[in-house]
Amino acid sequence: ADSHNHNDTGSVTLYKNGHPILVDIGVETYTQKTFSPRRYEIWTMQSGYHNLPAICGTDQKDGEEYRAGNVVTELTGTEPSISMELSAAYPDAGAIVPGLTYSRKVTLKKPSNTVVLEDHTNAQDVILNFITYEKPVFLSDGKLSIGEASASFEEADLLAIETLPITDARLKTAWDHDLYRIRLKMSGTDFQFTIK
């Protein structure tokens, strides 16, 4: 195991006006386990606690071969974006869904300061996780308020908004209160999450 790696390939962080919206939790206080083959038993290292999907009930694996492919960035113009294929990071899901595909594209639409995250897959069982600094408030079908941001999602159902207690001393230096996890179940094979 890489002693500083997290299973977070394709995860996204987002700030609005200097305030955290979608976050990376970080790492807890270092212990012997952190630098052992058991490091991925630590919740903050797992893809389920990053802004990523669980595909067919499985998370990303650790190892150099479990990485994004076909990474394309477009950084000019009014809609800079990054896209990538994430299926290689989910070998257990690939064993369940032969020929698994899972692509993610994130676009910043500059004129409206809107971020659009689009996921496409051939898997039928996908739960999306989004870690937030502020407690999300479910407003109506497909609409959330997250601190200063408004969010909407398409082709998914809200499963839960969970509280992630921040009790570790090192994490408390980064976060002054608990964090939250939004869990959405994709209802099809295409998903869109828009944040303004």
Feature roles, as predicted:
Residues 3, 22-25, 29-34:
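Cytochrome P450 core scaffold surrounding the K-helix E-X-X-R motif
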Residues 1-22, 76-77, 83, 174, ...:
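Carbohydrate-active enzyme catalytic cores, enriched for enzymes
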Residues 17-19, 26-28, 58:
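An acidic- and aromatic-residue-enriched active-site/binding cleft used to recognize and process polar
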Residues 33-36, 40-196:
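CBM-like, beta-strand-rich accessory domains located in the C-terminal region of large
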Residues 8, 17, 31, 38-40:
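Conserved nucleotide-binding/hydrolysis modules and their immediate coupling elements
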